[in-house]
Amino acid sequence: MPLFKRRDVNTPAPTSSIREKYDFRDVLGTGAFSKVFLAESKTDVGQLYAVKCIDKKALKGKEESLENEIKVLRKLRHNNIVQLFETYDEKQFVYLVMELVTGGELFDRIVAKGSYTEQDASNLIRQVLEAVSFMHDNGVVHRDLKPENLLYYNQDEDSKIMISDFGLSKTEDSGVMATACGTPGYVAPEVLQQKPYGKAVDVWSIGVIAYILLCGYPPFYDESDANLFAQIIKGEYEFDAPYWDQISDSAKDFISHLMCCDPEMRFTCQSALEHPWISGNTAYTHDIHRTVAVHLKKSLAKRNWKKAFNAAAAIRQLQLLRLSPIATAFRNKRPNSNQRLQLPNVLVFQYFCKIP
């Protein structure tokens, strides 16, 4: 049965092979089960795209998740959301033709800047809020908003911010959301408490991002996930001196309304956009780059170390899986239709989330 059974009426199924329409160039990234290529249109010379190539063998049993991501991306046409242009379902691979974004990750750009102000942070968060408000108006919850998924469109100094990676996104019409997902440190209390949740989880994540943008370090941190989650559930964070002494009370008030433990009392995207720190002129304009950049560099170094550690752990788990008696039994006899070899969760997570 074809992978893409239903298509957006505005997005007809391509009738040709992807390589008839695009020239594949450099590999931009490699994940556990996919690669992203730089591709140029053959009909519009010079027009470049990012093409995600997904191995169908690795996709088996997870088609519904990919279809959900594609369904979401087709719904969302916004200046601050990475666009999906076409999909190709071919014999061995599924291809997603995406908008090419070349400006780099949010934190990397801030560290590289010569100056950076609270007003700059306000402008960044405004763009994120506008895009997420658009998602919410269209019944979509992102569920994994974090700095790694906020990219600059290009290298221009005034480049816009783009939201990417909709692998964990969900539409409200697909049923009650109660699955624990997201990224530790950015996930909302109600998700950790395994309560039904909705759009408010995205607002919490934006609050965490805003906090980091103003000081360079996260509001919640512990080496132990259990302790980290306990902090988040209780909403235990501080505006520490001396780092927050140079930040406006308006910014602190704004963050407090986004990181409110009660989702019913938490700001919506629209109410956040109306707050003076976003819509007015209460954001300070003095340079905070030095303080923020110092902490961001430490956070980036730690994140990159964890990324390398998790990749190594995934490889070790896969090697153990291949050597295990269960895996050997599966290789030595054909499983019946009710048997399925389960890959380690970390591998599945790496595939459905952003390519490391």
Curated annotation (Swiss-Prot):
InterPro entries found in the cross-reference section: Kinase-like_dom_sf, Prot_kinase_dom, Protein_kinase_ATP_BS, Ser/Thr_kinase_AS
Instruction: Tell me the function of this protein.
Output: Calcium/calmodulin-dependent protein kinase that operates in the calcium-triggered CaMKK-CaMK1 signaling cascade which results in transcriptional activation. Transcriptional activation occurs at least in part through phosphorylation of crh-1. Regulates gene expression, sensory morphology, and function of the AFD thermosensory neurons. Involved in long-term adaptation of AFD neurons to temperatures warmer than the initial acclimatized cultivation temperature.
What cofactor(s) does the depicted protein rely on?
Mg(2+)
Which intervals hold domain Protein kinase?
22-278
- Please give the record's comment on domains: The autoinhibitory domain overlaps with the calmodulin binding region and interacts in the inactive folded state with the catalytic domain as a pseudosubstrate.
Q: Which cysteines are joined by disulfide bonds?
A: none
What positions constitute the catalytic site? D144
Q: Which UniProt keywords apply?
A: Allosteric enzyme, ATP-binding, Calmodulin-binding, Cytoplasm, Developmental protein, Kinase, Magnesium, Metal-binding, Nucleotide-binding, Nucleus, Phosphoprotein, Serine/threonine-protein kinase, Transferase
| Annotated stretches, region: Calmodulin-binding | 298-319
Q: State the organism of origin.
A: Caenorhabditis briggsae
- Protein name (Swiss-Prot/TrEMBL): Calcium/calmodulin-dependent protein kinase type 1
